[in-house]
């Protein structure tokens, strides 16, 4: 196979690589949780949570979801979130904090839109509509 043929068949760059890989995701996840935990409508969901472990799993999840080399090894989203009273309103708030953290990290708006498009289908597994406010 000639050089031109190989160049034409290059794999498209993953979102994971576009945003800077594992290190960039770690920075975004750290900022993301600062924002989420500062949100009075969301912070109570994380009461008693081992945040260090959660951040590690979140980095792993985002890396896998965005085309990184390693698979996500955590529990299924539905299992982790069921019965917690997370509504679409909460999901939208979380998505907004993610977009803000990505923007702060210098991720271009079109890439942020791609990322939110990857995350949006998870709403079905994460939300239950059982409550309109976080537990107190």
UniProtKB/Swiss-Prot annotation:
Binds 1 heme group per subunit. PROSITE patterns: GLOBIN_FAM_2 (PS01213). GO terms for biological process: cell redox homeostasis; cellular response to oxidative stress; detoxification of nitrogen compound; nitric oxide catabolic process. Gene3D superfamilies: Globins. Homodimer. Was identified as a high-confidence drug target. This is Group 1 truncated hemoglobin GlbN.
């Amino acid at each position: 196979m000639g050089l031109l043929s190989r160049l034409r068949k290059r794999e498209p760059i993953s979102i994971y690589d576009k945003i800077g890989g594992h290190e960039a995701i770690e920075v975004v996840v750290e900022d993301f949780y600062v924002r989420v935990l500062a949100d009075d409508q969301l912070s109570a969901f994380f009461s008693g949570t081992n945040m260090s472990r959660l951040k590690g799993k979140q980095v792993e999840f985002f890396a896998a979801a965005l085309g990184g080399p390693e698979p996500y090894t955590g529990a299924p989203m539905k299992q982790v979130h069921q019965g917690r009273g997370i509504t679409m309103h909460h999901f939208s708030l979380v998505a907004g904090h993610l977009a803000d953290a990505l923007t702060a990290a210098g991720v271009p708006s079109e890439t942020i839109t791609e990322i939110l498009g990857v995350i949006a289908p998870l709403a079905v597994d994460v939300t239950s509509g059982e409550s309109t406010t976080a537990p107190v």
